[in-house]
Amino acid sequence: HRQAQSQRARTLGMLLLPLEADFSIPLRRAPNVKEACAEAYGVGEEPSVVSLRELLGVIGAHEWRKKGVDIPVLGDRIHPHYGVFSPVRGEYIGLVAEAPLPTMKLAFDIGTGTGVLAAVLAKRGVKHVIATDQDPRALACARQNIARLGLLGRVEVVETDLFPEGRAPLIVCNPPWLPARANSPLEHAIYDPQSRMLLGFLNGLAAHLEPGGEGWLI
């Protein structure tokens, strides 16, 4: 099964489709992918080509962004953007929703992505959550989700590499789990080259925890 999947991925990666500057596909009966491509790539400037594999990923990300992912503990949906990890499998969210909280005062969410864990902590009653990321896609995604959930007064989204300034009694992190280099922006959310983020979190945790604080690696 894995071999068949790998072969399919290679085949889709070798098939190239033309895109006009406005992201239209100049082929008969081609679908309209303008909005999906604009969300993924920004403003088009010149004609280009894209692999079918990449384009299918762009379309899939667009659909997830439109309909969102249901998060039962929030009683609402999270809308992931292209290149930002989608919380489709929510086991780790359940852990954060149920684990005893050491504080209701302050928490850091490192590598927030969609902002889902920051939102869960805020919904549980943490008064101030600082959610960090350095990826522009993730920052925009988290800010939109936090605003839509009505949590702007409790969750602050900050652009920084790993930790914000200061210390907190609770620091959570759900890093990408594959220690390899991503082949496309769509894969960026699940790859951590040379475990850089994981090691950075572990090595910097003690310096950013308050005495007696807790770090949750999820």
Identify the role of each PLM range.
Residues 1-69:
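N-terminal auxiliary segments of SAM/dcSAM-dependent transferases
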Residues 4, 119, 134, 193, ...:
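Soluble or luminal CAZymes and related metallo-dependent hydrolases
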Residues 53-101:
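Class I SAM-dependent transferase core
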Residues 80, 146, 174, 201, ...:
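Conserved RecA-like P-loop NTPase ATPase core
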Residues 89-173, 179-183:
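Conserved SAM/SAH cofactor-binding pocket of Class I
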Residues 185-210:
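Glycine-rich S-adenosyl-L-methionine
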Residues 212-218:
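Conserved beta-strand signature within the Rossmann-like core of class I S-adenosyl-L-methionine
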